[in-house]
């Protein structure tokens, strides 16, 4: 056995809460679709973020990381393979925007590990109705077609990542679209993060009680600059210390 001596200490001071990775992920995507350069501070690298940065490069967006600041320079899609690493969120977030920007040409997504075993059926059932073709080749997913304007019905019990991907993709189109949630939306908070990021980029979505999302066509993403919001779940630990009488803010 090991004896540990714990000496109480008086904690006080100011703590900077790490940036929300979920918010950063969505802001990074909005910045990549903007009509100018964006600079986001408070950026924390992660496997998902690295995968998204790599994927966005194939869609024409260059990202440069310096300290905790990421510079995003949008560009013209190169048509190269979109490598999503092992990130399910990257794959689900990028499929609709890639279809919106592809001009109907074939798009290849690459994955590692068991990524291509992750569920994607909500997209396929929607897109097949719109004439989008897809096939899986081992760790590659090949899709051909265009993201079309119109109405899309999704279950609220599936991952909110599908809703986020559709919101981002449909906002890139010229015509109006609507997403209908067929039952209770389970992950409202994550969808709200997406709507907040889009609003910061100048893109409006009419949220009708999280049951219908109306996306006006012909909008343009504006550059997004500033600090990424803090992660409230990580900040809760320090708030707890403050409630216990410690002078932590």
Residue ranges, per PLM feature:
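Structural preference for solvent-exposed beta-strand-turn elements
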Residues: 1-249
């Amino acid at each position: 056995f090991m004896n540990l001596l714990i000496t109480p200490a008086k904690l006080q001071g100011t703590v900077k809460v790490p940036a929300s990775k979920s918010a950063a992920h969505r802001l990074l995507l909005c910045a990549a679709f903007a009509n100018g350069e964006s600079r986001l501070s408070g950026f924390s690298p992660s496997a998902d973020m690295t995968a998204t940065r790599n994927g966005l490069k194939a869609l024409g967006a260059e990202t440069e990381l310096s300290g905790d600041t990421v510079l995003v320079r949008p560009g013209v899609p190169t048509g190269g393979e979109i490598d999503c690493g092992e990130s399910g969120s990257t794959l689900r977030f990028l499929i609709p925007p890639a279809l919106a920007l592809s001009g109907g040409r074939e798009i290849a997504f690459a994955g590692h590990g068991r990524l291509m075993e992750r569920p994607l059926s909500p997209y396929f059932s929607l897109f097949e109705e719109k004439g989008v073709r897809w096939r899986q080749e081992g760790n590659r997913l090949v899709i051909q077609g265009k993201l079309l304007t119109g109405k899309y019905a999704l279950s609220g019990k599936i991952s909110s990542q599908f809703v986020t991907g559709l919101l981002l993709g449909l906002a890139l189109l010229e015509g109006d679209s609507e997403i209908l949630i067929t039952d209770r939306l389970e992950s409202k908070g994550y969808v709200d993060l997406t709507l907040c990021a889009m609003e910061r980029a100048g893109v409006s979505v009419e949220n009708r009680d999280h049951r219908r999302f109306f996306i006006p066509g012909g909008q343009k993403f504006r550059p997004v600059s500033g600090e990424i919001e803090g992660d409230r779940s990580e900040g809760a630990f320090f708030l707890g210390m403050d409630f216990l009488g410690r002078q932590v803010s």
